[in-house]
C-alpha cells in the first residue's frame, strides 16, 4: 500500500570529507545572506545547486568488503561500486530458553554504516542459513532499507519460517529466490558464485549454509557462513578451489569448521572472524587461529578489531575500528527470531 511504499523511501547522504563540508557550510551561509538582501531568485538558484550536489554527490566507487561489528553473529557488506551493494546475513542475538535479544543490532551496528556510506538500497540480501545470529535482524533491515532480492536455500528452513519469509518479501516487494535457481550472478564487474556443497538430510542447519565466492578482477573472496568441515570436504572433492585473498572464516572460528586440509588448500591472505567479546563459546577456537597463523594469514577478529573494511581496489588495504559498539538497550524480539533458535557445538 501507499504507506508501506512511503516508509520504504529512504534518502541517505554519504559522509563528506572536510573540504566538501566547509564548502557546504559557506554555501548555506551565503544563501542566508542572500535572503537578508531579498535576492530570492539567487536564493532559489543556489538552493537547487546545493540540493543537486547533495543528491548526485559521488560516493567512493571502490569495491570493498566489510565485516560489520555485530557481536556473536555474522553480517558482511559487499560494495561493488555504483551503488551495487550486497549484504550477506543480518546478524542477530542468540536466543535460547534463558537469553533473549536485548536490543536491535542492525539499528546501532548496520544501518549507521549503510547511511554513512550513502547506501539506501541493496541489490541482494543473501541469508546463509536459518540461525538467529545470521538472520535475526531481517525484519528490521527490510523495513528500513530497500532490497531487490533475497537469496536463501529453501531446504534449510522450516515451513513456518518459509511462510514468514514469503509474507515479508511480499509485503516489501522483494523477490525471494532459492539459491538453486540462481547458482551465480554478476553485479557490475563483480561475480558471485554459490557452491553446491550442502549436506543432504543433515540435522545440523549449519551444514545448509550458502557458501559464496566473490570474484572481482583477480581478487577472490570466500564467505563460509557457518559451514562445517563436512561442507569443506565436499567443496574440496567437487571443486578446484583457488587460493583466496579474503576468507570469512566459517562458524565464527569454531572447531567445527576450518579443517587443516581446507585452510592449507585455499591459503587465505586475510581471514575475518566475526565473534562477540567474552562470548560464552570461547570463540574463536585457539587451534583454528593457530592453523591460520601457520599459513601466515592476516587475522582480523571483530572482538579486537571491531568493524573491518578491506578495499579491493587499494591493494587490500584494511581499515578497522570499533564502530557500532552501542550499549543501549531496546527490547527487540521478532517472530522470525523466535523461529530460529540455535545452539553452538
Task: Label every model-predicted segment.
Residues 62-112, 121, 205-228:
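Conserved beta-strand hairpin/beta-sheet module of binuclear metal-dependent hydrolase folds
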Residues 85-89, 123-127, 149-152, 178, ...:
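Structural recognition of the beta-strand scaffold that forms the well-ordered cores
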Residues 132-171, 176, 268:
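Active-site HxH/HxHxD metal-binding segment of metal-dependent hydrolases
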Residues 330-345:
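Single conserved hydrophobic/aromatic residue that forms the stacking wall/gate
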Residues 69, 78, 89, 114, ...:
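Divalent metal-coordination and catalytic microenvironments
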Residues 1-66, 270, 291-301, 307-321:
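Transmembrane helix-bundle segments that form internal channels/tunnels in multi-pass membrane proteins
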Residues 106-113, 127-143, 196-284:
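Active-site-proximal loop/helix segments of hydrolase catalytic cores
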Residues 156-193, 203-206, 277-329, 334:
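Binuclear metal-ion centers of metallo-dependent hydrolases, dominated by the metallo-beta-lactamase
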Amino acid at each position: 500500500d501507499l504507506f508501506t511504499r512511503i516508509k520504504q523511501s529512504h534518502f541517505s547522504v554519504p559522509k563528506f570529507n572536510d573540504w566538501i563540508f566547509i564548502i557546504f557550510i559557506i554555501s548555506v551561509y551565503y544563501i542566508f545572506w542572500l535572503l537578508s538582501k531579498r535576492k530570492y531568485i539567487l536564493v532559489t538558484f543556489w538552493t537547487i545547486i546545493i540540493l543537486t550536489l547533495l543528491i548526485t554527490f559521488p560516493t567512493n566507487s571502490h569495491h570493498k568488503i566489510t565485516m560489520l561489528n555485530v557481536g556473536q553473529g555474522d553480517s558482511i557488506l559487499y560494495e561493488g561500486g555504483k551503488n551495487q551493494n550486497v549484504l550477506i546475513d543480518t546478524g542477530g542475538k542468540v536466543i535460547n530458553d534463558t537469553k533473549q535479544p536485548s536490543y536491535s543490532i542492525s539499528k546501532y551496528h548496520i544501518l549507521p554504516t549503510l547511511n554513512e556510506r550513502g547506501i539506501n538500497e541493496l541489490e541482494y540480501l543473501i541469508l546463509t542459513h536459518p540461525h538467529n545470529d545470521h538472520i535475526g535482524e531481517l525484519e528490521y533491515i527490510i523495513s528500513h532499507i530497500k532490497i531487490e532480492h533475497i537469496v536463501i536455500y529453501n531446504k534449510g528452513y522450516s515451513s513456518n519460517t518459509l511462510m514468514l519469509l514469503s509474507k515479508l518479501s511480499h509485503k516489501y516487494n522483494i523477490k525471494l529466490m532459492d539459491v538453486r535457481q540462481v547458482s551465480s550472478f554478476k553485479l557490475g564487474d563483480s561475480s558471485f558464485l554459490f557452491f553446491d556443497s550442502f549436506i543432504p538430510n543433515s540435522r545440523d542447519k549449519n551444514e545448509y549454509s550458502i557458501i559464496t565466492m566473490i570474484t572481482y578482477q583477480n581478487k577472490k573472496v570466500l564467505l563460509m557462513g557457518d559451514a562445517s568441515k563436512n561442507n569443506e570436504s565436499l567443496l574440496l572433492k567437487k571443486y578446484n578451489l583457488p587460493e583466496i585473498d579474503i576468507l570469512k572464516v566459517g562458524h565464527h572460528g569454531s572447531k567445527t569448521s576450518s579443517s587443516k586440509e581446507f585452510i592449507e588448500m585455499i591459503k587465505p591472505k586475510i581471514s575475518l572472524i566475526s565473534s562477540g567479546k567474552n562470548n560464552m563459546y570461547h570463540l574463536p577456537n585457539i587451534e583454528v587461529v593457530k592453523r591460520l597463523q601457520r599459513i601466515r594469514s592476516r587475522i582480523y577478529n571483530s572482538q579486537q578489531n571491531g568493524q573491518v573494511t578491506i578495499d579491493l581496489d587499494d591493494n587490500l588495504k584494511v581499515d578497522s575500528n570499533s564502530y557500532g559498539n552501542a550499549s543501549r538497550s531496546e527490547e527487540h524480539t521478532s517472530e522470525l527470531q523466535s523461529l530460529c533458535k540455535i545452539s553452538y557445538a
